[in-house]
Amino acid sequence: MLAQAERFIESQGFHLMTKDEIPKFTRCAMESYGNIVYALDDYFVGHPCTKEELWEMWLFNLKYFYSRALIYSDSPDCNAWILWIPPGCKGVSMIDFIRYGGIRLTLKLGLTTMKRIMHYEDYSASVRLKATGNSEWYLYNLVVRPEAQGQHLAGKLLRPMLEYCAQSGKPAYLETHSEKNVEIYRHFGFEVVSNDPIPGTRVTHWGMVMPKKQEVNNVK
């Protein structure tokens, strides 16, 4: 399933991330955050998240998902990129956690932070399972460099895979913790299916689904 989606994305003119480009994609993600405060990251670390802590989290995610997810950018310059987890993907095993830098991540962020991340991942997975039955293409990340914003790159990256999901009869799913983002994704046809605080926090978790075979809104 992943290989078929990768062939489709390449046919649309997008650039698939290579293993050597993981640091480049991580830098793009870091730049996309800029000085924006994300409540979820602050919850993970228990204080305003530093750039060093954010770097470690992004780097681990991209190393882990490199061979498991669909990760592509607008071009080799990587002004924007997106990560989709294919249907049926399971959580991180202990062996893979260690293999892709989990010990380093724990040493850098601390055991308490790792417990918070696992608490969130368990909650997120339960919400997603209820919404889609684990049959979805899961939009895990979408980032755009600040200097590239306003060029409609987010829509450019999103639309082909939304069409792919519709044609293959699979729902598309995402989650966000920003009310502003909820309105943005509604323009693409996503519907809110959950809107609750993450247990034990004040961080609101929106789960959004684009139902099977729904026409993709042609917005920039």
Segments the model singles out, each with a brief description of its role:
Residues 81-143, 149, 199:
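Conserved acyl-donor/pantetheine-binding loop and adjacent beta-alpha core of acyl/acetyltransferases
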